[in-house]
């Protein structure tokens, strides 16, 4: 046995000195100091104060829960192309759009099936309480987005700096656009959530995860989101020289995801289907294209971005130049070689990607709010860069960085809250009225004089139907409940009920009649008003094909009535008082009508 003795002595063995600091912890801290961030050299560590995981998670969770419960559904595509097929998977019935006809097959059942996995668990736990199942699915979507937000936030703190990460997560938390998009059941929202993961993986140089996220977003979500993989592709191929790794990883991941998707979709459609290719061909190459569903000027996106991001949208365009200015200032003493500017490459590539997305979708005639969802993470990121770089370039010298940053975020949060409340106040009743319908059908005990099945009808408000999750399967006496359409001024193609069958694949493989991809009206979709037991309508003056139920008191009586904005008469201050809630002024200048649930008077 070897002992340690004093040099030149024969005394007792020396004990090692007490360990005050754990060596592994010290080594980890040492390594941490050596990490260079965007603006921080090795000898100048980023000692800014960070948000803790707990505080970020709690803030995000509270907002995403609120969005799942109170966020409206502002896109009929979400209902009829996603909620209704999911309802079919869970309860055996729902509405079918032409996109799910095996003739066209431009939607993916694999995407629906991913949501069916947690949804089936909720349905088993809560039985026929379908609104609870609906809310829990939205919350699950929100949680998936939440984890991506935190992953991106953590990567920004590690690779850019803590202040930028802090601003980024605050913008993401308070954004009214994120409030709605984070719990929406549409592929563009799915791609938006994955963009957070892409951003985090890219900054962390986790190439395999980044490629997987881009591939999954592109193939399962929306094929156009392949654009979001531009930074990873350019960095790996042009800057890092990882060509073989990129090609092999992309092939393996693409074949795995594509294989599972093709097998799943082909099973449900009854023929070989690659849905991402079909939707690309329809929109870009051979199909009639989305312009059948309306065209908007470029100002549509400008207004939309302002409504959803208010003052942040003015800061975001300056994120790249201001960040570049401060980066150059910090590193100007170094040799300006290619390696130095490669450190700034992620900012350049992310800026190019954002600009490319805006250019592609801004140039399309058909524009929708959800088309911008996938770049929401980049908007928050570049606005955070702009605010942080402004502080570093000039405000710190004036001693005003903290004050102005707090004021900026406070102003953003107030405007976002104003926008979110305005949306709920003006349009929220189209969901709440169906909660009233659900309560009416669930609590009522006498349905003797009702039709069998009991029929709920909608006319001009067909596009605001929140899905069959709000319609009970049966009532107390066992009668089924169904929703149908009555004629309105709308002249396009409405969805039709899926085929009724005990076997799901028989339903999904069935080729429905009276379907087309030209948005041409099919009269067979309509039922006679006399066959309806309930009607949900927004009360407006009568037109040729739209009755005013308020004046039909002998036949229809209101069960519940909730305020709903009359957009055509609420144009004060160019619609700003409709877009944002301003105490007293919004109530003064906006004109409200009512969204009403009517029941036949003799029932």
From Swiss-Prot:
UniProt lists the family membership as follows: Belongs to the glycosyltransferase 22 family.
Q: Which GO terms describe its cellular component?
A: endoplasmic reticulum membrane
| Transmembrane intervals | 109-129, 131-151, 167-187, 196-216, 219-239, 246-266, 311-331, 344-364, 371-391, 398-418
Give the source species. Caenorhabditis elegans
From the Swiss-Prot or TrEMBL record, give the protein name: Alpha-1,2-mannosyltransferase algn-9
Localization, per the record, is: Endoplasmic reticulum membrane
Q: Outline the segment boundaries, as ranges, of region: Disordered.
A: 1-25
Family matches, as InterPro entries:
GPI_mannosylTrfase (IPR005599)
Function recorded in the entry: Catalyzes the transfer of mannose from Dol-P-Man to lipid-linked oligosaccharides.
The annotated topology with respect to the bilayer is: Multi-pass membrane protein
GO terms, biological process: protein N-linked glycosylation
Q: What class of enzyme is it?
A: transferase
């Amino acid at each position: 046995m070897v002992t340690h003795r004093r040099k030149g002595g024969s005394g007792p063995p020396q004990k090692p000195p007490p360990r005050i600091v754990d060596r592994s912890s010290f080594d980890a801290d040492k390594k941490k100091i050596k990490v260079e961030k965007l603006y921080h050299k090795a000898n100048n560590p980023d000692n800014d104060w960070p948000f803790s995981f707990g505080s970020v998670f709690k803030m995000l969770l509270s907002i995403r829960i609120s969005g799942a419960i109170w966020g409206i559904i502002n896109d009929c595509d979400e209902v009829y192309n996603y909620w209704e097929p999911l309802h079919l998977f869970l309860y055996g019935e729902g509405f079918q759009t032409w996109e799910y006809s095996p003739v066209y097959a431009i939607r993916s059942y694999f995407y629906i099936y991913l949501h069916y996995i947690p949804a089936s668990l909720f349905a088993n736990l809560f039985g026929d309480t379908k609104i609870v199942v609906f809310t829990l699915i939205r919350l699950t979507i929100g949680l998936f987005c939440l984890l991506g937000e935190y992953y991106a936030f953590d990567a920004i703190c590690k690779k850019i700096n803590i202040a930028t990460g802090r601003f980024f997560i605050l913008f993401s938390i308070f954004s009214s656009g994120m409030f709605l998009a984070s719990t929406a059941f549409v592929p563009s929202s799915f791609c938006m959530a994955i963009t957070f993961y892409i951003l985090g993986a890219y900054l962390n140089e986790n190439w395999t995860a980044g490629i997987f996220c881009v591939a999954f977003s592109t193939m399962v979500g929306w094929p156009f989101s392949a654009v979001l993989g531009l930074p990873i592709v350019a960095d790996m191929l042009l800057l890092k020289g990882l060509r073989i790794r990129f090609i092999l990883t992309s092939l393996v991941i693409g074949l795995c995801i594509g294989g599972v998707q093709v097998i799943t979709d082909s099973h449900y459609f009854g023929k070989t289907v690659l849905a991402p290719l079909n939707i690309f061909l329809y929109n870009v190459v051979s199909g009639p294209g989305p312009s059948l569903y309306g065209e908007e000027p470029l100002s549509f996106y400008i207004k939309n971005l302002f409504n959803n991001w208010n003052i942040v949208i003015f800061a975001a365009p300056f994120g790249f130049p201001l960040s570049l200015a401060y980066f150059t200032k910090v590193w100007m003493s170094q040799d300006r070689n290619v390696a130095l500017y490669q450190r700034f490459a992620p900012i350049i590539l992310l800026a190019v990607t954002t600009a490319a997305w805006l250019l592609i979708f801004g140039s399309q005639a058909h524009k929708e709010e959800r088309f911008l969802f996938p770049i929401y993470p980049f908007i928050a990121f570049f606005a955070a860069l702009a605010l942080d770089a402004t502080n570093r370039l000039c405000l710190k010298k004036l001693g005003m960085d903290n004050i102005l940053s707090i004021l900026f975020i406070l102003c953003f949060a107030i405007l976002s809250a104003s926008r979110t409340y305005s949306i709920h106040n003006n349009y929220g009743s189209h969901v709440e009225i169906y909660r009233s319908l659900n309560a009416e059908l669930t609590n009522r005990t006498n349905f003797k004089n009702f039709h069998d099945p009991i029929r709920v009808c909608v006319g001009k408000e067909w596009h605001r139907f929140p899905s069959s999750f709000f319609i009970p399967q049966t009532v107390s006496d066992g009668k089924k409940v169904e929703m149908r359409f009555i004629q309105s001024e709308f002249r396009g193609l409405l969805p039709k009920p899926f085929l009724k069958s005990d076997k799901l694949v028989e339903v999904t493989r069935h080729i429905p009649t009276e379907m087309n991809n030209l948005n041409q009206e099919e009269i067979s979709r309509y039922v006679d008003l006399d066959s309806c037991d309930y009607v949900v309508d927004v009360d407006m003056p009568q037109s040729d094909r739209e009755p005013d139920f308020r004046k039909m008191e002998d036949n229809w009586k209101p069960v519940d009535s909730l305020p709903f904005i009359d957009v055509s008469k609420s144009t004060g201050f160019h619609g700003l008082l409709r877009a944002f809630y301003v105490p007293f002024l919004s109530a003064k200048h906006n004109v409200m009508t009512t969204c009403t649930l009517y029941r036949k008077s003799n029932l």
